[in-house]
C-alpha cells in the first residue's frame, strides 16, 4: 500500500 503521506502535509 502507499506510505503514510502525513509527513507530506504541512503541520
Curated annotation (Swiss-Prot):
Q: What is its main location?
A: secreted
Q: Give the function comment from the record.
A: FMRFamides and FMRFamide-like peptides are neuropeptides.
User: Which stretches are transmembrane?
Assistant: none
Q: Give the GO biological process terms.
A: neuropeptide signaling pathway
Q: Where in the cell is it found?
A: Secreted
GO cellular component terms attached to this protein's record: extracellular region
Write out the similarity annotation.
Belongs to the FARP (FMRF amide related peptide) family.
Protein's organism: Karoophasma biedouwense
What's the name of the protein?
Extended FMRFamide-10
Its keywords, alphabetically, are: Neuropeptide, Secreted
